[in-house]
Amino acid sequence: MKPTLVLVGRPNVGKSTLFNRLTKSRDAIVADMPGLTRDRHYGHGKLGKKPYLVVDTGGFEPLVKEGILHEMARQTEQAIAEADAIIFVVDGRSGLTPHDKEIANKLRRIDRPVFVAVNKAEGMNSGMVEAEFHELGLGEPNAISAAHGEGIRGLVEMALESFPEPEEDEWHSDSVRVAIVGRPNVGKSTLINTLLGEERVIAFDAPGTTRDSIEIDFERGGRKYVLVDTAGMRKRGKVFESIEKFSVVKTLQSIEDANVVILMVDAQADVSDQDAHIADFILQSGRALVVAVNKWDGLDAYTREQTRQILQRKLKFLDFAKFHFISARDNIGLGNMFRSVDSAYAAAMAKMTTPRLTRVLIDAVAKQAPAKHGLFRPKPRYAHQGGSNPPIIVVHGNAVDQVTDSYRRYLEHTFREAFKLQGTPLRIQFVTAKNPFADKDKK
C-alpha cells in the first residue's frame, strides 16, 4: 500500500506550492482533460521506485472553535491521525511564529513521524534558517524552496525511508475489488446494506490496514466481489449501521486498492468541490469508474433535468464513465449499476492485439490526419498495448509527440469505440521514431 504524506502548516507558508512540486510527475496525464478541476488537495507522486500519496490540508488553525476554520482544523487533525508521515511546513522568511508553536504542540502528541520543512529558504544560509525551528522539538528542520525545487528530494527521501518498495504484482485476488466512495450521508452504507440483503450473504469485518478499511466479501451472479467501504461501518447482526464521517486517507487508499470505484453523488445536493476532488483523484489513479447518483426517486421531472445538466457541467471530465440514477434505499437501478461495474472492470483489463490496434490507428489517420506542426505533419504508423488497469496504448511514428490535445482526444474516442472501453480511463502515449541520420549530421 502506498504511504500517505500529509502536508500541514499555517496559511500562506507554501503548502500548495510544495504539493504541486511533490505531485508534478502525474500532472501531465490529466492536464489536457477539459473541465478538470485544478485546485487539487490529493495527488500522487513517485521517488525512484517508491510511489506515495500526498494530502494538502489547507491552513491549520488548531485553536479556532467554530465556523469553517474549525471544520478545516477538524479535518486536518483527522488526516494527521491517519497519515503515515507528516510534513510540517513553516516559513523561513517569516521565522518562527506563535501559530507554528500551536501546531507543533498538536503534532508532538501524534504517534507519527514528523518532518519540519522550512520553506522559502532560497538565497538564505540554510543553517541560520533552520536554527530557530529547533525550538519546535520535532527533530532536525530541513531548509527547502518549494518554488525552486531546492531540498525537496532529500526531504521526501527521509519521509519515505522506512517504507519498502511495492511488490511487483499487487493484484492477487480472483475477486473484483469495488470501492464505494462519496461524501458523508450520500448513501454508501444504504447501498451496501441493500446489496448484501439482496444477495442474502453473511458479511464480516476484515480490518486489512492500519486505517481499518472494511472489506466485505460477497457474490453476485456467480462472480466474487470485495466491497471496500470507508464509511466506518460496523456489524449489527446481519445488517450494518454506520456513523458516516469523511476520511480523506481512507478514501484515497480505498481508491488505490480498488479495481473499480463507485463514486456516489447525492442527487438532492449540489456537486461539491469535495466530489470533484475525489473524481479528479480517481482519474489520476487510472481506476475504472461508475458514478451512482443516489436519492433520484425524491426529485420531480424538472429538478431531474436540472440535476443532469449540473452533473454534465461539473463532472464533464468523467465522460468515459457510466452515470446511473438510483435509489439505494429502494433498490432502484442497482442491477444496471452493477452491470456497469462488470463492464468497466472488463474494459480496464482489456487485452488488445498490436495488429488490430494498428488497423484502428491507420483507419483513424486516414479519416482525419493530424494537423501540421511547423513544417512537418505527425505521422502515426503503428500502435501496441503498453499496459492495463488502466489500458495504455502506445502510438509510434514520426513527430507524434507533436500531436495536438484535440487530436489525442480524437484518437482516444476512436480507440474507445473500437474496443468498447467505456468505464475506464485510457492513456495514450506517443513515441517518436529516432531519426537514423541525426547523429551522422552532427559529425
Swiss-Prot record:
GO molecular function, one term: ribosome binding
Residue ranges of domain KH-like in the record: 350-434
Stored InterPro entries: G_ENGA, GTP-bd, GTPase_Der, KH_dom-like, KH_dom-like_a/b, P-loop_NTPase, Small_GTP-bd
Ranges where the EngA-type G domain occurs: 3-167, 176-349
Residues that, per the record, bind GTP 2: 182-189, 229-233, 294-297
Gene3D superfamilies on file: 3.30.300.20, P-loop containing nucleotide triphosphate hydrolases (3.40.50.300)
Gene Ontology biological process terms, A to Z: ribosome biogenesis
Keyword set, alphabetical order: GTP-binding, Nucleotide-binding, Repeat, Ribosome biogenesis
Source organism, top-level taxon: Bacteria
Sites where the protein binds GTP 1: 9-16, 56-60, 119-122
Family: Belongs to the TRAFAC class TrmE-Era-EngA-EngB-Septin-like GTPase superfamily. EngA (Der) GTPase family.
Subunit structure: Associates with the 50S ribosomal subunit.
Function (record text): GTPase that plays an essential role in the late steps of ribosome biogenesis.
Protein name: GTPase Der
Top-level taxonomy: Bacteria, Pseudomonadati, Pseudomonadota, Betaproteobacteria, Rhodocyclales
Gene: der
